[in-house]
């Protein structure tokens, strides 16, 4: 299966259900978590994931919109970036 990898970041005030609801949206788009790191710093929830989605029949714009909408309903900020763009922006 060919795939495309993304970096997904989630930041906001901690509350119950953030991981469950964000990953439910991901599963509905057949997006798999390759790696994940999550922590809470003084009440601020932070999570970064390396995720993989099928290249075929994957609508990135719709996925980004769904993730953004879920983030807004949770009161957190969700960013979805293609791995290549993320690496380019964060190179030294």
Swiss-Prot record:
User: What InterPro entries is this protein classified in?
Assistant: ACT-like_dom_sf, ACT_dom, UPF0237/GcvR_regulator, UPF0237_ACT
User: Which stretches make up the ACT domain?
Assistant: 7-81
Q: Name one Pfam family in it.
A: ACT_6
State the similarity comment.
Belongs to the UPF0237 family.
**HAMAP family assigned to the protein according to its UniProt record, in alphabetical order:** UPF0237
The protein in question is named: UPF0237 protein MM_0082
Q: Which organism encodes this protein?
A: Methanosarcina mazei (strain ATCC BAA-159 / DSM 3647 / Goe1 / Go1 / JCM 11833 / OCM 88)
